[in-house]
């Protein structure tokens, strides 16, 4: 299923508003990785953030990778999006679940951890990718990205991410909101924006009752006279293929491939992002080795 990212600005072009209903995308995360409730919330939030950031990609071959490496029980979380709006994600320990917090919310902060690094890699196919890194603030992900954007862009930024997991572990709703001041923004509008944000309910709950994300923006930020700049389709789709896996095997070198042939006589590689299995016979491994 395909979701849509909506990109808007206000009448004074002081702020960019991005909003996405990522329910179907996060359901794919759940289905592929068989995540626990807490893991679904954590990886779902990160995947939603990747979808939101896809608006920066003007070329289909460009991509952004988000990496959370905290001290929590979930281990490493990764989400990558390309210029086509295709998101793929991974978590080290999808099976880990944690007790809910006292407010009955899923404990994403403990799953990720509040000590560690958030890394953003933007590959625009230049000589070197851009790599930005900040320390984790809470592990709740939205706060960590708000801090990242404040540190990297030096502009006021609001990030809201939410995943509502049903009792059967399916994804009831998921979505994200991103608001950032644009260069030369009207500072007199900050107080009004903060007032509207304080009235904003939990983002995931809104997509239970609203079908159109842009309607949500217009409802809660009506004073800003928003205009829609564009829409972008986003979905969970892994771009792995056999050729790429073959190149990975070749990169091991002749010696390692020879050991693999002699000891196992075959190989099975599993994609971390979609769990697709690639099997290679002894003859296929020998052919790869002989072509090095």
UniProtKB/Swiss-Prot annotation:
SUPFAM superfamilies: Hsp33 domain, HSP33 redox switch-like
Location in or out of the cell: Cytoplasm
PTM remark: Under oxidizing conditions two disulfide bonds are formed involving the reactive cysteines. Under reducing conditions zinc is bound to the reactive cysteines and the protein is inactive.
Chief localization: cytoplasm
SS bond list: 238-240, 271-274
Pfam family, one: HSP33
Assigned keywords, A-Z: Chaperone, Cytoplasm, Disulfide bond, Redox-active center, Stress response, Zinc
GO biological process, one term: protein refolding
Superkingdom per UniProt: Bacteria
Alphabetized GO MF terms: protein folding chaperone; unfolded protein binding
InterPro entries: Heat_shock_Hsp33, Heat_shock_Hsp33_C, Heat_shock_Hsp33_N
Protein name: 33 kDa chaperonin
Gene that this polypeptide is encoded by: hslO
């Amino acid at each position: 299923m395909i979701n849509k990212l909506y990109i808007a600005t206000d009448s004074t072009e002081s702020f960019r508003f991005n909003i996405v209903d990522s329910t179907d995308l996060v359901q794919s995360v759940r289905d592929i990785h068989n995540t626990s409730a807490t893991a679904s919330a954590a990886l779902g939030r990160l995947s939603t953030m990747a979808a939101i950031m896809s608006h920066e990609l003007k070329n289909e071959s460009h991509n952004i990778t988000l990496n959370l490496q905290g001290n929590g029980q979930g281990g490493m979380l990764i989400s990558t999006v390309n210029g086509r709006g295709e998101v793929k994600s991974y978590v080290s320990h999808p099976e880990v679940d944690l007790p809910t917090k006292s407010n009955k919310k899923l404990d994403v902060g403990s799953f990720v951890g509040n000590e560690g690094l958030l890394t953003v890699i933007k590959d625009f196919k230049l000589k070197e990718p851009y790599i930005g890194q900040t320390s984790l603030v809470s592990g709740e992900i939205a706060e960590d990205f708000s801090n990242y954007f404040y540190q990297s862009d030096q502009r006021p930024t609001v990030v809201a991410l939410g995943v509502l997991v049903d009792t059967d572990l399916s994804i009831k709703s998921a979505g994200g909101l991103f608001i950032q001041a644009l260069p030369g923004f009207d500072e007199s509008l900050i107080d009004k924006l903060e007032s509207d944000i304080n009235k904003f309910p939990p983002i995931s709950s809104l997509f239970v009752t609203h079908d159109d994300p842009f309607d949500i923006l217009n409802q809660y930020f009506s004073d800003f006279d928003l205009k829609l700049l564009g829409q972008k389709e986003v979905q969970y789709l892994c771009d792995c293929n056999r050729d790429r896996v073959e190149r990975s095997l070749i990169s091991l070198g002749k010696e390692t491939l020879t050991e693999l042939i002699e000891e196992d006589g075959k190989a099975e590689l599993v994609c971390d992002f979609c769990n697709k299995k690639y099997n290679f016979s002894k003859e296929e491994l020998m052919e790869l080795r002989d072509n090095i």
